[in-house]
UniProtKB/Swiss-Prot annotation:
GO terms for biological process: proteolysis. One of its GO terms (molecular function) is metal ion binding. It comes from the Eukaryota. It is found in: Membrane. This is Putative dipeptidase UREG_03382. CDD domains: rDP_like. Hydrolyzes a wide range of dipeptides. Its main location: membrane. The keyword Transport does not apply. Keywords: Dipeptidase, Disulfide bond, Glycoprotein, Hydrolase, Membrane, Metal-binding, Metalloprotease, Protease, Transmembrane, Transmembrane helix, Zinc. Residues 1-33 are annotated as: Disordered.
Length: 453
């Protein structure tokens, strides 16, 4: 059993000496009544003193447990309930494109606070003030780069993708370091919880490099790669081939590393293929319900049911086109609520989360204009009958459970002695400098080198 598993307390045993019936009870003497009174008074004083000491050191955990959070709340005071939920459970957003917006508008320069007034306020969806107003508890910062401009470019063709990805990882980490009172860089689920208890927003990276701190990989973006078919490819009328043979090996290696597999942006067949291969729960970092809006970026109900079996989580996005493909201009916060409730109805409350895509879309729903609006979203869900416990699962507990489970599976795989995967994709090109004299490792080295040409 993982050390992360909650320890279940056994039922309280029946205490010996208690009368089993009224017939076994005999009134105490006056002397015993006096001893009992003194003993009870002493115990009451000790308990009161202990409680005061306990509350002194435990309750003031930053913004986590304020004195008012333990007071009863009117069940119809949805705003107060939402506030308490977000003060005690980290709301973790699965996808925010602020690092890419910084790239576009400041060329990744963040230290001049007049040119990038992150603390004073930005016109876009995310800044320090909005984060505090929205009670954000954790954020996966997207460090993606775009697909090549030339659609015919293959995976072996030279491009700037690796360079730019490394730059995006760098700027995201520097942004976190620049605002240490607000943000805290994390690579584990336990760190995310710890940061929240300190009143900081756990900050995680989402793309494709584990040793550089990245903790989830979106299998494709808006173009196919060596691993799988993208949703945009199918939307363009091309075949849905799903996961490639190399993609299957890729999934196994992600399981070994403990990286979360993100199925947003992939085709429907890729979703099904990955779910048939992975040993770890998956995430959809920013997708919604296909049953409610027939956009190929959304998740069909049969996949939602498979996610339930897999143990994963679908994090509902706020992109209007995904919420109402036939009328995106009319989308409001209530449409986001509808998608959350549908995913919860089909997959269960253990398998739904929030993945806004703030700062990655020019248009947002009315009522969900930026990061500060999370409390209102939770409030509306409570008005629709969602329980506090269900809301806690939605805002962060589900994602943290999935993350911890992926880590546990990786520990087990690595403890078994499984080596890193050495497979490569079909048609992989290798290059070698033919004019540089090198020693030979084998008798047939010359033939081996010709195969690289």
């Amino acid at each position: 059993m993982s050390t992360r598993d909650h320890v279940k307390q056994s039922p309280m045993p029946v205490q010996e000496g208690y009368p089993r019936s009224s017939k076994e009870f005999s009134p105490p003497s006056s002397r015993s009544r006096k001893r009992t009174w003194v003993r009870n008074l002493t115990m009451s004083l000790l308990i009161a003193a202990g409680a005061a000491t306990f509350s002194k050191y435990i309750f003031p955990l930053g913004s986590i447990l304020g004195a008012g959070s333990l007071q009863p709340i009117d069940p119809h005071d949805y705003a107060a309930r939402a506030d308490r939920i977000l003060s005690t459970t980290p709301l973790i957003d699965g996808h925010n494109d602020l690092p890419y917006l910084i790239r576009l508008e400041t060329k990744n320069k963040i230290y001049d606070h007049e040119k990038l007034p992150f603390e004073a306020g930005l016109l876009s969806h995310t800044d320090a003030k909005k984060i505090r107003q929205g009670k954000l508890g954790g954020q996966f910062w997207s460090v993606y780069v775009e697909c090549p401009a030339d659609p015919s470019a293959g995976i072996d063709d030279p491009s700037w993708a690796v360079r730019d990805t490394l730059e995006q990882i760098d700027v995201a980490k520097r942004l976190v370091d620049e605002y240490p009172d607000l943000l805290e860089y994390c690579e584990t689920a336990s760190c995310a919880r710890s940061a929240f208890k300190k009143g900081r927003v756990g900050s995680f990276l989402g793309i494709e490099v584990h040793d550089l701190g990245v903790r989830y990989i979106t299998v494709t973006h808006n173009c196919d790669n060596a691993f799988a078919t993208a949703a945009s490819t199918v939307a363009a009328g091309k075949p849905d081939h799903g996961l490639t043979d190399f993609g299957r090996e890729f999934v196994k290696e992600m399981n070994r590393l403990g990286m979360l597999i993100d199925l947003s942006h992939v085709s429907h067949q890729t979703m099904r293929d990955v779910l048939s291969v992975t040993n770890a729960p998956v995430i959809f970092s920013h997708s919604s319900s296909y049953a409610l809006s027939k956009h190929l970026r959304n998740v069909p109900d049969d996949v939602l049911r498979t996610v339930t079996k897999n143990g994963g989580v679908v994090m509902v996005t706020f992109v209007p086109l995904f919420l109402k493909v036939n009328d995106p201009a009319s989308v409001t916060i209530h449409d986001a609520v509808d998608h959350i409730l549908h995913v919860a109805k089909v997959a269960g409350w253990d398998h739904v989360g929030i993945g806004s895509d703030f700062d990655g879309t020019a248009v947002v729903p009315k009522g969900l204009e930026n990061v500060s609006k999370y409390p209102r979203l939770v409030e509306l869900l409570l008005e629709r009958g969602v329980t506090d416990e269900q809301a806690r699962k939605l805002v962060g507990e589900n994602l943290l459970r999935v993350w911890s489970k992926a880590e546990d599976i990786a520990y087990a795989i690595q403890a078994s002695g499984q080596k890193p995967n050495e497979e490569t994709w079909s048609g992989r090109k290798w290059t070698a400098a033919a004019d540089i004299p090198m020693p030979s490792m084998f008798n047939d080295s010359a033939e081996r080198r010709k195969q690289l040409e």
